[in-house]
A protein has these predicted regions:
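ABC transporter nucleotide-binding domain
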Residues: 73-161
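A generic structural signal for secondary-structure junctions
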Residues: 23, 44, 125, 187-188
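Non-catalytic alpha-helical coupling and interface elements of nucleotide-dependent molecular machines
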Residues: 2-8, 129, 188-191
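C-terminal coupling/interaction segments
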Residues: 146-195
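Non-catalytic surface loops within mature trypsin-like serine protease
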Residues: 26, 135, 164-166
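Conserved protein kinase catalytic domain
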Residues: 19, 74, 121, 180-184
Length: 195
């Protein structure tokens, strides 16, 4: 608090309130090095909020967190986003889906898409397809299509989810688009690198 220039009189009260808000009251006397990754992230958020900033900027805030801590941290960020602007730079699309009311997608330093999550996802309606195929056909189609997901089925088949302007496999059906699909549509090079 002293490094933030807070007056000593109100600092203790503000620290207590923030520790409670980020669920760290029980570990307040522990050294930061002894805390889990998620707890360290919450300490960072509490430190950033000491001066009650209007804008909070976070880079990859949930990277490396286990699923439970990730959900807890996303919920915390959503709560803080109600009172201030929270800018998040991340490649973890699910974080954005659950936190952001408004999204901007940047490529090479330029905004290439901006809207609500629902508005962005609408941009790729009728570009996400799904088709169940026999396992032995997988290799044939996996490299010809922009496959975004494979799901093994109990009957030994595979459900392909892929991106295309029109269905590429007979009997393909439209699939409900997600924000991750939009990301892969806008950044096809990400899929090429994975092949």
């Amino acid at each position: 608090a002293a490094l933030k220039g807070l007056p000593r009189t109100g600092a203790a009260r503000q620290i207590d309130a923030l520790l409670e808000r980020v669920s760290l009251t029980e570990v307040r006397r522990k050294k930061i090095i002894k805390l889990s990754g998620g707890m360290k992230r919450r300490v960072g958020i509490a430190q950033a909020l000491l001066n009650d900033p209007e804008i909070l900027i976070l880079d990859e805030p949930t990277a490396g967190l286990d699923p439970g801590e990730r959900v807890r941290f996303r919920n915390l960020l959503s709560e803080f986003a109600q009172e201030r602007i929270v800018l998040i730079s991340t490649h973890i699309v699910s974080d954005v889906e659950y936190i952001a009311a408004e999204n901007a997608v940047m490529k090479a330093g330029k905004i290439i898409a901006q809207d609500t999550t629902e508005g962005l996802v609408k941009q790729i309606e009728a570009k996400v397809w799904q088709r169940n195929i026999p396992m032995e056909q997988l290799a044939r189609w996996e490299y010809r299509l922009r496959v975004v997901n494979l799901r093994n089925e109990p009957d030994g088949t595979v459900t392909l989810r892929y991106l295309a302007d029109a269905p590429q496999l007979p009997d393909s059906v439209p699939a409900q688009p997600r924000l991750e699909d939009l990301y892969l549509w806008l950044f096809p090079e990400e899929m090429e690198e994975a092949k």
